[in-house]
């Protein structure tokens, strides 16, 4: 009987007294990045860079993520991104943003707002020195594009929900609290 009690005592002594696992996590963040619009918009495919003279601007974002231990329910990340550009350009006759072509060439103020909010539902597949998250995102655009000339004005409302896949890979540097992420 003595060997059994010694074995049991050794097993208890080697067992950690606490187990560490994430119970709930709340993550908040904000940032800014330089972005430039590219491509065309409107019925006559107006070039955002060469025709409208929209240039690189600093735009901000903020996010919140909630993680929990329930395996069947996905985690949630909400992110709001402000994306606005303004400029001024000579608009030629026939330029058509939204079905009402400009009748004369004129100087116009341009604004492009691609502000959007992301709702991401994801599962945390790895959560140790490396993190792997996979899920889906619904991106809700709520913006507009407008051309305001001396005699005419046109506006397009830009409202749409865009479904996307979501993935995040992170690697932690042990004992430093630093993490490199790619999403």
Predicted regions and their residues:
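Cleavable N-terminal export/targeting peptides
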Residues: 1-24
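Short glycine/proline- and aromatic-enriched beta-strand/turn motifs that initiate or cap beta-hairpins
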Residues: 21-84
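Residues that define the transmembrane beta-barrel architecture of outer-membrane proteins
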Residues: 22-24, 44, 56-60, 113-117, ...
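Residues on the lipid-exposed face of transmembrane beta-strands in outer-membrane beta-barrel proteins
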Residues: 28, 62-68, 119-123, 136-138, ...
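Transmembrane beta-strands of outer-membrane beta-barrel pores
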Residues: 30-36, 80-86, 125, 138-144, ...
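Flexible, solvent-exposed loop segments that connect beta-strands
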Residues: 38-52, 86-112, 142-157
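Outer-membrane beta-barrel strand-turn architecture
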Residues: 68-72, 125-129, 171-175
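Transmembrane beta-strand segments that form the barrel wall of outer-membrane beta-barrel proteins
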Residues: 176-183
């Amino acid at each position: 009987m003595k060997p059994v009690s010694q074995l049991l005592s050794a097993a208890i002594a080697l067992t950690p007294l606490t187990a560490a696992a994430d119970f709930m996590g709340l993550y908040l963040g904000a940032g800014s990045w330089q972005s430039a619009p590219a491509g065309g918009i409107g019925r006559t495919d107006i070039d955002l860079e060469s025709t409208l003279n929209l240039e690189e601007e600093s735009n901000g974002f903020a996010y919140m993520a909630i993680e929990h231990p329930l395996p069947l329910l996905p985690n949630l990340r909400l992110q709001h991104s402000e994306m606005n550009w303004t400029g001024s350009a000579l608009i030629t006759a026939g330029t058509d943003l939204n079905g009402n072509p400009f009748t004369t060439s004129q100087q116009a103020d341009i604004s492009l707002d691609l502000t959007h909010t992301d709702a991401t539902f994801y599962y945390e597949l790895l959560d140790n020195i490396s993190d792997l998250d996979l899920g889906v995102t619904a991106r809700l655009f709520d913006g507009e594009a407008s051309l305001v000339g001396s005699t005419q004005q046109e506006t397009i409302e830009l409202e749409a929900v865009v479904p996307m896949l979501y993935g995040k890979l992170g690697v932690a540097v042990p004992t430093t609290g630093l993490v490199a992420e790619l999403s």
